[in-house]
């Protein structure tokens, strides 16, 4: 059924299709009996999938990545779609329209997306109001970024303001310094710039704080950020954001689409490399959330055994449809049982621990 729906949706410009799907999901989730039925049909049921990460209980490891529900306007939908949690955002301290359209493109031959959305959102205060009214069925994380008009020199206060507004209402908070679509944002990944931002956010909230990084960092920069995260006692690292690399793309005309970040399978190999390096560096001292190019249960299992405590997806959901999260969770549960693991936690990093030193 979904392949037909996807073909029809792909006849519509991507951002319009996104809004249409959003309206349908919100409408369905607004009807409590329908929402409960969907959760019974699509939600995770095997208790082996549940885990406690940075003090938060997750019913299953695959969550909706930031960028899909930027303003938390479909908060009740994501548990019904089978996700174990959802990350809302990116939100900024001040509302902003983002970059001019067109700003979202399908790379169908690569099962990928190119976006240069530019943190379009209603602002952290509007999200805080929605979160305060919401009774979560699954954990809800919030991803915060820098307002475009805020100069880099005032980035600390900008992130602090967002953390103050949404931190107390979120299951966890992610500091996004890695989107390629806000000028100068990735420069904040340099340790000397990142340290005061993370320190300020940590001081502002008791909610677990993570940092989201780019896949395009050098290995030495990855090591520096990992060490800083441990030093500042962060809850974890989200790896990775979209890539600016165009290597290996097969979709015709991609060079004419302009700048932006690529998500989906073209990102997978680098996302795994980054995950493995981070896990080898920090071990169990930080929780690692792996995102980028996860399409199947095999992909998900590779990330878990490479060191990911949690997973996220966005592009895979668009191409995979309503059963995507369910199929991945069922595949993970099957591999846990077949491998003799008593819990998801036991499997995290198991492939790295077996490697000879």
From Swiss-Prot:
InterPro entries: Aldolase_TIM, DHO_dehydrogenase, Dihydroorotate_DH_2, Dihydroorotate_DH_cat, Dihydroorotate_DH_CS. Transmembrane segments: none annotated. GO terms for molecular function: dihydroorotate dehydrogenase (quinone) activity; dihydroorotate dehydrogenase activity. One of its GO terms (cellular component) is cytoplasm. Catalyzes the conversion of dihydroorotate to orotate with quinone as electron acceptor. NCBIfam families: PRK05286.1-2, PRK05286.2-1, PRK05286.2-5, pyrD_sub2. This is Dihydroorotate dehydrogenase (quinone). The lineage of its organism: Bacteria, Bacillati, Actinomycetota, Actinomycetes, Mycobacteriales. The gene is pyrD.
